[in-house]
């Protein structure tokens, strides 16, 4: 009797298992919205700045385990890799960084790892060189702050798709689909930004910040950009630079100037006092905001949230 009962239970168990497998298969492939996942587990990816990490997450989706070295408020110009950072880079299957010497103090590490066979990609490599801006001061390299011209930053998606696909060919179709979706989202974001900027008359579109991170922003959305420091925060501004900026503010009757989340605000506060102009708010320049911090329905810890926060802050302060 016990033997018959055991066989019956076994048959029921096998039947239940088959039903579970059938349901799982339908759930995974029934919609046809994305290709089936490979069996290799999540691809381990390490990225540098918050903007690059966001880009990797957009393209990689649930097939990638992405970790960023830099968080909110971190200045990549001055960032030096710690021992734990190097360990994380060594443990990654793919490394993405922004490039154009934004992470200047880490360049040697990237080059050594690439020579050692590690998959290392500068996401800005897929941006045409003739689209890059060069500072008037005769800097030997282009302005690295390309993420503020949304259509330009969207071209970086191609490098991310390629880098992930090279490491995990079985998921290439998945990464390609997500890359195209990310480009569409950025095209929509750019159109929103253009319309938001147009709420300001051209004569009021003067953006004054701590360092020269917004030239691409100015080109894309019609702002004259004036900064106290150059494209890198490594070189500090002198007294003559501050006096010149104060004169410019007074002459042009600028209504507000702005501090940056990744740059100490002391000099801009001093300019504000000397010129008698208000500080219009804090902009995200070299890093996004804190993930999960919501503002007007968008997450400040995302690329979309960064762009929308900056446009809203600037337009509202200069109206």
Spans of model-derived segments:
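Extracytoplasmic metal-acquisition and chelation regions
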Residues: 12, 26-319
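Bacterial N-terminal signal peptides that target proteins for export
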Residues: 1-14
